[in-house]
Amino acid sequence: MTSYSFTEKKRIRKDFGKHRSILKVPFLLAIQVDSYRAFLQGDVESSQRKDIGLHGALKSVFPIVSYSGNAALEYVGYKLGEPMFDERECRQRGMSYGAPLRVTVRLVIYDRESSTKAVKYIKEQEVYLGEIPLMTENGTFIVNGTERVIVSQLHRSPGVFFDHDRGKTHSSGKLLYSARIIPCRGSWLDFEFDPKDALFTRIDRRRKLPVSILLRALGYSNEEILGEFFEINTFHINPDEGVQLELVPERLRGEILSFNLTDGGSVIVEAGKRITARHVKQLEASGISALAVPDEYLIGRILSHDVIDATTGELLASANSEVNEDRIIAFRKAGIESVGTLWVNDLDRGAYLSNTLRIDPTRTQLEAQVEIYRMMRPGEPPTKEAAQNLFHNLFFTFDRYDLSMVGRMKFNRRVGRKEVAGEPVLYDKKYFSDRNDEESRRLVSKLGETSDILDVIKGLCEIRNGRGVVDDIDHLGNRRVRSVGEMAENVFRVGLVRVERAVKERLSMAESEGLTPQELINAKPVAAAIKEFFGSSQLSQFMDQNNPLSEVTHKRRLSALGPGGLTRERAGFEVRDVHLSHYGCLCTIETPEGPNIGLINSLAVFARTNQYGFLETPYRKVVEGRVTDEVEYLSAIEENQYVIAQANTLTDDNGQLTESFVPCRFQGESLLKPPSYVHYMDVSPMQTVSVAAALVPFLEHDDANRALMGANMQRQAVPTLRAQKPLVGTGIERTVARDSGVTVNARRGGVIDQVDAGRIVVKVNESEIIGATDAGVDIYGLIKYTRSNQNTCINQRPLVNVGDIVASGDVLADGPSTDIGELALGQNMLIAFMPWNGYNFEDSILLSERVVEEDRYTTIHIEELTCIARDTKLGSEEISADIPNVSEQALNRLDESGVVYIGAEVRAGDILVGKVTPKGESQLTPEEKLLRAIFGEKASDVKDSSLRVPPGMDGTVIDVQVFTRDGIEKDKRAHQIEEYEIKRVKKDFDDQFRILEGAIYARLRSQIVGKVVNSGVDIKKGEVITDPYLDGLKKSDWFALRMKDEVAVEAIDRAQKQIQAYQKEFDQRFSDKRSKITQGDDLAPGVLKMVKVFLAVKRCIQCGDKMAGRHGNKGVISNVVPVEDMPFMEDGTPVDIVLNPLGVPSRMNIGQILEVHLGWAAKGLGHRIQRMLEANAAIADLRKFLNEIYNHDKSLVGERVDLSQFSDDELLNMAKNLTDGVPMASPVFDGASEQEIKRMLDLAELPAGGQTQLYDGHTGEPFDRKTTVGYMHYLKLNHLVDDKMHARSTGPYSLVTQQPLGGKAQFGGQRFGEMEVWALEAYGAAYTLQEMLTVKSDDVQGRNQMYKNIVDGDHQMVAGMPESFNVLVKEIRSLAINIELEDN
């Protein structure tokens, strides 16, 4: 039995799951948090750090040695400082949340004169290397005041890949095979066949060269190349005639001989017959070692080595040349006894390398390297050193080439080597053994006889010969995840490499001029690289903060786009499609609709990345048909070797598989296998889906396309005023809410000491207090009415009362879209599926007015409006209440500084911040000059540029922030805000100190009461300390007490030290905060002052708003109908929403119907509990009824709620929380069955069929037949008509065409396009059409005149020449065709 936490006891969700969960859902943000923690290694001792992340990047670039070699800069260690501002301050001030990185480096200068490398002097120093962004505990970064998420990238793993062109290159449709070595950084190396079966190579996708040039550049001769790639047939040449072949029977298979093949007189194969496998076996059995063949058999064969006349030294035939009659005669003449030829055939031993050597123009290693230099650097004259250096740097030095640990592992596995570790560069035995430097000797001694490039070419030839298979690049074994930490490390390394170049130049100066490390290193390149990555990389995205689910999903997203990834336009169908290997790793449902479909994926619930970055998913081990509780993670490559059963496979109590044939997966196929064959079993039915899809109840009854929409639309739900838990959920709502970080969870257990709307104080349990300095008090500040990235409202509400006992992890406060710690995205609405006067045509939704009245879908949106005062050429702008030509009424909401009051209710067009801008001097009329002379300068040299409420917006001012540049005097409002902020901080610190002090005194009291005194204030020696005595004593006098008991004396001293330490710490923290608040702000160049005004906008639901269920059943509200007109049930309850029944069958999302039935049952059970409470039923009866709800069926794992754990008060409290409906969980792919839903309906005393008689609200008549009615969790999506509705009379125009701009953001007009023109033409509305195309659009004079005419009350219109026609004329003139307009 599970024990229930304080939060869970408030409300338990009835679970219909039939399969016990072995593995808890892992921490959902682990992919982000763990990756960045490994990158920083901030809490790891310097000596213990692994070679990854910052440490790895610094170690790979240092030491930096000067060009002369007499000075070196070595890396010692690094430490991260404390961030200057905390997260809240960074959000407020628009700053980035990060910590300074300080690296300790050592400058070593060697003595030039000494013959050995003697150290002249060493200088060690700490160098500042810029700010490193810190991750918040919820996996986000704060960059320039906004929360951003670095999305993980799914890219092709480094390593070697074999592929073919699918017959698309050549017209014959012949498959051209290719191989590609992809490093983590460095040049790509490709090998490819051409249609004539010669093998070519490309470096970095440049022009192709015969592969033999690359091999020759490595130092191989023709003979060595042929020896590596071919098996040799040896022929002994008889002095007279005929040839003896050293027989390897297997090599004759498939050949047709022109002579009889005999064994001691008996013919094995007749002339002209093909040699088959049977003949080969006979030959092997006969034991013939040599075979006499005629000279013709040798003609046309290819020599494997040079044939040289031993006496004269003359070259008779070179390697790779064909044998002909003349050559055989020459061989006999020269007394050549034996020659070797290549064993090739057209079937499975292609002469590919031999063909390639024929087209290779180079002869020596240097020629080959020069040829590669010419290809890489066309136009540059090659020298010997340049060619050798370029070739070496391409693949053989770590500075320029890095396969990475992953790449080496994939490479070695693919070419069939045992060990997975190795060098990050490409290794070749011949090339490195010919070089004579220390590094090469080290590599040769370590790696010996292997050769990477040869192995790849051999592998490619094998595949071309029909042995071996090409790789599937869409398999997850060939795609890996690059998370935040790795990307940040790469960027950091790039910055360091830039620094390295500059340091190398300066190091030579350091020798002579005695520079320090700080003077050598300039941190700018590193800081710039990091800032660019976090601020503007394609994968650094503005966080989707609509609701907790959208945050979690955004952090768990995997994108195939981004630097080094795919592009939308070039990605084909295969990359986007669901692949067999996605099972349990990537969600098969959740992906965006539109151009990114399939390129952006979501991590499955249980998936994680392994040390190499490949996705892996957990499985339960099965031993001899018995399922164990041992869990193993397998990657996509590993799971290929095993037979894996589904999670819903039937087992008995001992875990033995009961079915005689179990449905399994093996190598991507679905099979039925006996239990003994099964190796593993899925851990959970929801293993294949992502968090968003796992939140859709009855997902198994929905069509995949609709499920996709349902998963995506949950992310767009706007948090409502009062969150309401879904009646029908899936059981992971609590996990999602907890991991998203929007709720406040107790860090340690204890008793609630204080609660108010903004703060919760917990007195920690004695057992959980760590160390002597820990006062055992946890203070949680709550977020109040803060704006999210999507302008929705983030607000936390406490759930606990003073005196409540909480344990670690309990939910103390709800955030947006959470209800008692469970995710609650929408509201439970009473729904009827029926047509209603055409108002639910085409997915429209009919809504009851009651929903609006009860504010069920009212949402609060917080808009941030900014007013900036800049320094202009004509003088500085000023924020003030003194604005020209504005009525008193317009200024009545502003204070004397010109800033709106908090709490003011404002509407579109109202002034929020008064601002005046200097105007350019214009020519003055004599009258103006006179007035100026009399009344002084000021009046007309400024214009009004105040911040006003944008059109279509109204709300209440809830916060104002004033930022003033350093050195500029703050106005009165800024001082007020400052004082308020300081007071708030002071109160916080005072309260904290008071609570801590109280806790220390309370603990001390328990330790000294009852002890005998030696000395003290107002007490005699030998008396016993009592509670009343301590109550009458001043707190400071407690410390004067001295007892006989040494332990008590120690406790008093310890308490005094603790209080003094806290006092000192709090004073220091307060002065730090105070100086932060009062210091000037760091504003953009040219900005003197910035005022931010926050408006809270209340949005009620209305026609045109978009709503949706969780099954992809979306629609737009068509009408809001009075309650009395809505269809109602027998007991008079009107329905809230009427949906179109025709929206269900064609969409095949039947899940919504099951949800409605079960939701109705849940609500009905809640009503029954309410009736019991109202009737003051006995607790025993209540317990019995709850037992009947939760524990009726023993097959359900989620059942067996142990109600005996609940005290009577706890049970009553839970029952009160259940009156609104008993929440149910129907887990994904393991949900409630039809019988269970019917049973619940019976228990709730509702019709088991789920349908009831409805009556027409207009007439009161019953409808013809019964209707499906029930409760569905319905969401309001962030597509609000208020945000889209927009009207324009006059506004901005485009400069070139003089037509109005488009779109709400530009305050644009509505386009009257080609088809609309046709419509007016069809009506014959000529004047309307003329007006549309001229004065209402781009006839400049006409529209100005029209405006004047309307003002004068003269309603005439004169249409002139549209500007777009002038543009057309100009465009035609640019083609040198002159068009002139003649007056008629």
From Swiss-Prot:
It catalyses: RNA(n) + a ribonucleoside 5'-triphosphate = RNA(n+1) + diphosphate. GO terms for cellular component: DNA-directed RNA polymerase complex. The keyword Hydrolase does not apply. Transmembrane segments: none annotated. InterPro entries: DNA-dir_RNA_pol_bsu_ext_1_sf, DNA-dir_RNA_pol_bsu_external_1, DNA-dir_RNA_pol_su2, DNA-dir_RNAP_su2_dom, DNA-dir_RNAP_su2_hyb_sf, RNA_pol_bsu_bac, RNA_pol_bsu_CS, RNA_pol_bsu_protrusion. Its EC number is 2.7.7.6. PROSITE patterns: RNA_POL_BETA. Gene3D superfamilies: 2.40.50.100, 2.40.50.150, 3.90.1100.10, DNA-directed RNA polymerase, beta subunit, external 1 domain (2.30.150.10), DNA-directed RNA polymerase, subunit 2, domain 6 (2.40.270.10), RNA polymerase alpha subunit dimerisation domain (3.90.1800.10), RNA polymerase Rpb2, domain 2 (3.90.1110.10). GO terms for molecular function: DNA binding; DNA-directed RNA polymerase activity; ribonucleoside binding. Keywords: DNA-directed RNA polymerase, Nucleotidyltransferase, Transcription, Transferase. It is an enzyme of class 2 (transferase). It holds the Pfam family RNA_pol_Rpb2_45. One of its GO terms (biological process) is DNA-templated transcription. Belongs to the RNA polymerase beta chain family. The RNAP catalytic core consists of 2 alpha, 1 beta, 1 beta' and 1 omega subunit. When a sigma factor is associated with the core the holoenzyme is formed, which can initiate transcription. NCBIfam families: PRK00405.1 (NF001616), rpoB (TIGR02013). DNA-dependent RNA polymerase catalyzes the transcription of DNA into RNA using the four ribonucleoside triphosphates as substrates. This is DNA-directed RNA polymerase subunit beta. The gene is rpoB.
